[in-house]
Amino acid sequence: MKEQSPAPELWSTIDALSEWLDTNRPVEGREGLLLRILKLTEEVGEVSEAVIGATGQNPRKGVTHTWEDVQAELCDVVITALVALRTLTPEAREVFGGHLERVRERSVGSK
């Protein structure tokens, strides 16, 4: 598989999704913010469901998902996390980039 960097429009898409959600948010203020962050839990649960389905761990249901389903659900987790970060700060791109660099330095950068 060819390695790809994030699409150039990643952050503009995250901004657009955040704005769209803000426009259509049924709950405002702190509660709305908390609900947006809690959405991550729902998405992670969907990853778990897909893994269980891909491995056939539920004998009553058998194999119900594919590993491509797991990939899609993981992408949903990433998107939801970035939208939540963008909701917390308009500098989400810089915050994420700085944090990613710190993680890189303390792991692969320390070799």
Q: Where are these predicted regions, by residue range?
A:
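Flexible "arm" and connector segments at domain edges
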Residues: 1-111
